[in-house]
């Protein structure tokens, strides 16, 4: 019609209505993504700074505050997940046909990098019931992706924005300064107090524990709930806990009938002779750590049948909280500490307990340093209890040697230190764990490839122990437990014969060495080997 808008010529393409790549609603979502990402940058600079400080100094600076900020990292990452993916999809849909193909291509690369960053974070978080990755190699790859991809994201974002509105560099610089000052200030403060491992406890605490040689890191007692916390450990280490339940370590305390009889008699005699139970402490440093370090052992009225701690045995924490072996004397000459747990470890609230588990699964390094120290891989650690002497305070007589597995191991050829080591075995075994804690297949958290093929954990049955304990303690599976010990002991005894003397006397004719010529022994005659 006259006066109306001009119509396009017939056959010409209709003009599309301009749709901005980032509209008003999408701009609000982008602002939320930027805000969350900015907070994550500040938090990440601090977390990486602590890791770098630890790598440079060899010290441990992670603590409760660090774990809280790591929890904040997980929360911010979870909050960023949907907005980032949602904005990326919407922005892609709006901008996919833009004529600036270079900006579109860089945008695709940027969105891919963001997805990689978020996916690696999900893999590392190991959400219960959703995605739990235990393979150490996969986690290592995911960690490096999570650390390096943010650099690519920042670079690609700058390239992508060069095709659009002018970048406000001033805002970025200000936020970088804030991140550096915040993280740097916290690092300076945190660097003043590294976590101290492998330290001997104060001598002042001996008065609570002598004649046992054990000490605590503070010189005081440790709450029973801290030491007797196996159910907490079993949540992530079920296979390890199952093997431990069948071990002699589980039945080390008043739940072991022969030990119960022995320690009752020792406590009775000590009380009658000395007026207190101090002499009986000699047993408790190795056999009754929960009762002992919580201060209950000295109670003459301690109920060794019905008190829950009496049946605790040698618990997970009782071994793994040991932080120092004070000397090779044995008799529990070690220092044990109250371990620093992740936040909410003892919470009765299910939600907070779940948060605690997620923190450990997502960031297990500090947990591992706390509960698995280098000393746990040494024969001196085992020797702290597998080497015994009877002190005068106990027997009222004199110092006497008791069972001593530690010295006999060192004097044997197996250790590589004994005189027989020059010919047997072909390869020495440097520590007790090499034989008594062989790897067993498992998918527990903490399992690793000992042979390069199968995930495995160290066996906490400790085969070769007393085979009678399981039956005496009433363990339903005792026949199978005994068989496992027997299988371990099959063929382990070796008797080396260097020569024989005829007549069975010391001055008889000697035939030696027995190789390569082997003498023929006559049945019925006597020989001295």
Where are these regions (language model features)?
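Compositionally biased, low-complexity flexible segments
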Residues: 2-5
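Soluble catalytic regions of membrane-associated enzymes that act on cell-envelope
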Residues: 227, 231, 235-238, 244
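Membrane-embedded alpha-helical bundles that constitute the cytochrome b-like, heme-associated redox core
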Residues: 7-202
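Membrane-interface helix-loop-helix modules in multi-pass inner-membrane proteins
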Residues: 80-91, 98-132, 136-145, 277-281, ...
């Amino acid at each position: 019609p006259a006066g109306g808008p001009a119509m396009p010529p017939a056959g010409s393409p209709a003009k599309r209505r301009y749709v901005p790549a980032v509209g008003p609603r999408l701009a609000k979502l982008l602002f939320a993504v930027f805000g969350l990402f900015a907070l994550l940058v500040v938090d990440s600079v601090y977390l990486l700074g602590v890791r770098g400080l630890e790598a440079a100094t060899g010290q441990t600076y992670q603590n409760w505050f660090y774990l809280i900020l790591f929890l904040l990292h997980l929360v911010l990452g979870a909050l960023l997940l949907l907005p980032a993916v949602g904005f990326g999809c919407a922005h892609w849909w709006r901008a996919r046909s833009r004529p600036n193909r270079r900006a579109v291509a860089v945008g695709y690369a940027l969105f891919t990098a963001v997805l990689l960053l978020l996916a690696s974070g999900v893999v590392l978080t190991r959400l219960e019931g959703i995605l739990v990755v235990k393979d150490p190699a996969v986690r290592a790859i995911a960690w490096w992706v999570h650390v390096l991809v943010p650099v690519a994201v920042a670079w690609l974002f700058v390239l992508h924005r060069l095709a659009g509105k002018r970048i406000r560099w001033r805002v970025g610089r200000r936020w970088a300064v804030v991140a550096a000052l915040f993280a740097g200030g916290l690092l300076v403060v945190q660097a003043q107090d590294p976590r101290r491992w492998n330290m001997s406890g104060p001598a002042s605490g001996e008065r609570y524990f002598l004649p046992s040689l054990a000490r605590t890191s503070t010189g005081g007692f440790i709450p029973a709930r801290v030491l007797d916390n196996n159910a907490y450990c079993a949540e992530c280490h079920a296979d390890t806990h199952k093997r431990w339940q069948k071990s002699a370590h589980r039945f080390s305390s008043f739940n072991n009938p022969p030990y119960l009889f022995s320690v009752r008699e020792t406590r009775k005699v000590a009380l009658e002779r000395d007026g207190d139970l101090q002499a009986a402490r000699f047993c408790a440093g190795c056999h009754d750590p929960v009762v002992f370090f919580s201060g209950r052992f000295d109670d003459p009225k301690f109920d060794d049948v019905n008190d829950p701690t009496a049946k605790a045995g040698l618990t997970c924490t009782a071994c793994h909280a040991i932080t120092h072996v004070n000397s090779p004397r044995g008799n529990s000459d070690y220092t044990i500490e109250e371990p620093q747990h992740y936040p909410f470890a003892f919470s009765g609230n299910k939600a907070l307990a779940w948060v605690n588990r997620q923190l450990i699964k997502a960031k297990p390094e500090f947990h591992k340093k706390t509960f698995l120290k280098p000393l746990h891989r040494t024969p001196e650690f085992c020797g702290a209890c597998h080497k015994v002497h009877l002190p005068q305070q106990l027997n009222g007589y004199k110092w006497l040697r008791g069972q001593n597995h530690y010295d006999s191991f060192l004097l044997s050829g197996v250790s590589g230190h004994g005189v027989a080591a020059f010919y047997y075995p072909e390869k020495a075994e440097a520590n007790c764990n090499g034989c008594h804690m062989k790897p067993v297949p498992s998918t527990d958290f903490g399992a690793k490839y000992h042979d390069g093929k199968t995930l495995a954990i160290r066996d906490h049955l400790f085969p070769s122990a007393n085979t009678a304990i399981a039956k005496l303690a009433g363990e339903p599976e005792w026949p199978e437990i005994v068989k496992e010990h027997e299988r371990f002991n099959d063929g382990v005894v070796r008797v080396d014969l260097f020569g024989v003397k005829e007549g069975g006397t010391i001055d008889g004719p000697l035939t030696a060495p027995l190789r390569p010529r082997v003498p023929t022994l006559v049945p019925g005659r006597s020989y001295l080997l």
